[in-house]
Every structure is written in structure tokens, then in C-alpha cells.
Design a protein with these regions (language model features):
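Short, extreme N-terminal segment that most often corresponds to the first beta-strand
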Residues: 1-32
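Charged interaction segments
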Residues: 36-159
């Protein structure tokens, strides 16, 4: 049995909602968008075919963010997305123009002042083990959290 996980973010606001929404969709996430008193908000969640949080990479082609993928995805997915982009731009693909970046570093640059993103992933593999992790992102920093490690830290400090 394979690992199964569910991912959920809080609501947050970014500079370019359309771009972030497109990139999250390319990673297989559902994205909800709404207006809260004139402020565009969005959140994302899993559709069971999305990337695992720890593997999310943003693929750039010629400096333009194209697709979010994961290390375990077939390179063919990346090239297909870049081919589609190049076809629209009517240019040939130059492999030297492909770069990747941790998606959450990119997301940091998109956050509006005072905004933070909290994303959790909870999963299991045939209930043989369970896991929980998350990432908290602000404009200045992001940090990973592991549920098991955080619980053990609490126990160690309080027993």
C-alpha cells in the first residue's frame, strides 16, 4: 500500500493571486479564492494527486515560473509543461534555461505584508504508521514542523 496524505493550508493573501493559483493547480492542489472586504484571499488543499509538501519545487523556464512539481514526478511532466509554454511563445526549448527553486521560497516572495501561510500534511501508509508535518511561512522565514518530533520534544521537556 502506498503513502496517502491530505494537505490543507490556512487562508492567505499574495501579490499575484492568479500566478500562485495557477502554480498550485499545476502541483495538483485545489485552490479556493474569495474576496474578504476588498482583500483577495486563497487557500489550497489536496486532491489526492498533489505533490507532497517536502518535494515541492518550482520549475522556471527562461526566468518565468512554469510549473510546480515534486522530485518523484517523472521528468516528462516538467518537459511537457515547458513544451506547452514554449509552443505558446513560439520558441524552441533550450534546456540550459530550465531552473528549479524550492516552492516555499518563491511563496515567501509573494506574501503580502503581515501575511503567513500554514500548511499541514497528515498521512499514513495502510495505517502501519501515521505522519504529520507542516510548514509555516512568513515573508522573513519559513520553518518545517514534524508532529512526532514536536511531541517528543514536549515529553522530554516535561517529564
Amino acid at each position: 500500500m502506498n503513502y496517502v496524505a491530505q494537505v490543507l493550508s490556512n487562508s492567505f493573501s499574495v501579490k499575484d493571486t492568479k500566478l500562485v493559483k495557477r502554480l498550485l493547480g499545476s502541483a495538483g492542489f485545489y485552490v479556493d479564492e474569495w474576496n474578504d472586504n476588498g482583500k483577495e484571499c486563497l487557500c489550497f488543499y489536496d486532491n489526492e494527486d498533489s505533490a507532497y509538501l517536502c518535494d515541492m519545487n518550482l520549475v522556471y523556464y527562461n526566468g518565468i515560473p512554469i510549473v510546480v512539481t515534486a522530485d518523484y514526478n517523472d521528468d516528462e511532466d516538467i518537459y511537457q509543461a515547458i513544451e506547452e509554454y514554449a509552443k505558446v511563445k513560439e520558441e524552441d526549448i533550450d534546456e540550459d534555461l530550465i531552473e528549479t527553486q524550492d516552492f516555499f521560497i518563491f511563496l515567501q516572495t509573494q506574501l503580502l505584508d503581515g501575511e503567513a501561510v500554514q500548511v499541514t500534511e497528515v498521512g499514513h501508509e495502510g495505517l502501519r504508521y501515521q505522519s504529520g508535518c507542516g510548514v509555516a511561512i512568513t515573508k522573513n522565514k519559513y520553518q518545517w514542523f514534524d508532529l512526532k518530533r514536536e511531541m517528543q520534544k514536549f515529553v522530554d521537556e516535561n517529564v
